[in-house]
Amino acid sequence: MKRLKDAISKGEILFFGAWEGDALVGCCSITVGFSTFDYMPSGTFEDFFICPDFRHKGIARQLVQFAYKSSPISSMTVACAQCDIQMYKSLGFSIQLGSLFAFEP
């Protein structure tokens, strides 16, 4: 938990929310890293959720765009399950960068 708190306090993980009055109806985070490709900060989009009653109303797209524009990043990627690819494409993640593999020691 301390490592998470430290990362948040250093701005390495940024959290964003979508609100309807006092109710949190959506959230996401961006983990900030550094891209050696373009020598700029880059972000990994994570922790994405929209409450079921608020889906298909444009909130997800607004949240993604707000998070990107509010972050100090020049690019943003997301890793997702095959079943979520179309959703992320509809939200603006349109450049496929090959395949992602997780290392297992």
Label each region the model flagged.
Residues G33, C51, A81:
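Residue-level recognition of the GNAT/N-acetyltransferase active site
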